[in-house]
C-alpha cells in the first residue's frame, strides 16, 4: 500500500494547511507543526519506493483539492461551479498520473 502512504501524507498536509489559517491556541499550533513533520516524513518515505515526481504531484494535488473541499465544507468558503470543476480536473490529472506510473521507482511506462 505504497500509494496509501502518499494519501496519508496528503491528509496531514491538509491538516497543517488548515492549521496555518485557523490555529488560535498553543495546542493547535503544536498540532499544526506535528502535521507538517508527519506530512513530509511520510512523503519522503514514499519517495524512496515510488517515482518521486509522481509522488510529489499526487501529494500536492490531493492536498490542494482536499484543502479547498475542507474550506468549503467546514468554513463556509464560497463554492462555485468553476472552482469545483477545476478541482475535478486536478483530481483527474492526479488519478491519471497514478494510473500510468509503475509501482517501482525508476520504472517507466
Curated annotation (Swiss-Prot):
Subcellular location: Cell membrane
Any Pfam family the entry gives: Multi_Drug_Res
Keywords carried by this UniProt record: Cell membrane, Ion transport, Membrane, Transmembrane, Transmembrane helix, Transport
UniProt cross-references to InterPro entries, sorted A to Z: Small_drug/metabolite_transptr, Small_multidrug_res
GO molecular function: transmembrane transporter activity
Claim: Ion transport is one of the keywords in the record: yes
Transmembrane segments: 3-23, 26-46, 55-75, 81-101
Membrane topology, as annotated: Multi-pass membrane protein
GO cellular component, as recorded: plasma membrane
Known role: Probably involved in guanidinium transport.
Family according to the record: Belongs to the drug/metabolite transporter (DMT) superfamily. Small multidrug resistance (SMR) (TC 2.A.7.1) family. YkkC/YkkD subfamily.
Name the record gives this protein: Probable guanidinium efflux system subunit GdnC
Organism: Bacillus licheniformis (strain ATCC 14580 / DSM 13 / JCM 2505 / CCUG 7422 / NBRC 12200 / NCIMB 9375 / NCTC 10341 / NRRL NRS-1264 / Gibson 46)
